[in-house]
Amino acid sequence: MHVIDLEFAAIDGVRLAGTLHLPDRPCSPLVIGCHGLLSDRRSPKQLALAQACNREGMAFFRFDHRGCGDSSGVLERDTSLEARCRDLLGAIGHLARRPDVAGPFGLFGSSMGGAVCLAVAARAAVGPIVTFAAPVRSTPLLAAAAAPQVPAEMRRMAEVIGPPFDLAPELPQLRNLLVVHGEADPVVPVAHAREIYAAAAEPKRIVLQPGGDHPMSDPRHQQEFMLAALRWLTA
């Protein structure tokens, strides 16, 4: 296996940083990972999925969205769903020029990263999609963050999430989709997962984790997710 740090540009020119994990095989199928709103490319889920994909003969690319990690920009100023879509489209375009990976590329996104994957998949040719805790729209999250005694993470998300978005019109265009969600997620309620699954076209699958939270902190849920994601991405 080979690990390569890369710099590339979003489609609007913003400089971004990423890491490509290549297995020991030529022209590997590739999965691109999109991290959550307050995370970066070093998130545990992305690192674990990169290693697991390599063991299955797939390449994995994880990158920092603008304003996060080693990429340029300021989180509070530059974050929006559309801006992060431009980041992902830049990654797709950059990697499509490499001879050592093969498309169409699979997508994985966690939380806001899942929303980015859904939005891009509705406008670009991609392979299998896996989301975890992806929101359909931002308005209910912003309203919930204004209530007293909400998790600090939710308040922070509301500060940086950017303009409101609603992906409901795009959902019927999606297919080849695995939706994973914790049933007790206090940040993105499980109703979002049910809405995504109901609207998407076949093939599709939903995995709801009883008692599951937003960061997927239960090791049993992590194992369940990894097995389901690998099956979906390699089918």
Residue spans for each PLM region:
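N-terminal cap/lid segment of alpha/beta-hydrolase-fold proteins
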Residues: 1-25
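The serine-hydrolase catalytic nucleophile loop
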Residues: 38-50, 191
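Catalytic nucleophile-loop/oxyanion-hole region of alpha/beta-hydrolase
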Residues: 41, 69-101
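Hydrolase active-site cap/lid region
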Residues: 119-161
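Short beta-strand/loop motif that positions the catalytic acidic residue
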Residues: 173-174, 179-181, 185
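Acidic catalytic loop of the alpha/beta-hydrolase fold
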Residues: 184-188, 215
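Catalytic histidine-centered segment of alpha/beta-hydrolase-like enzymes
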Residues: 212-224
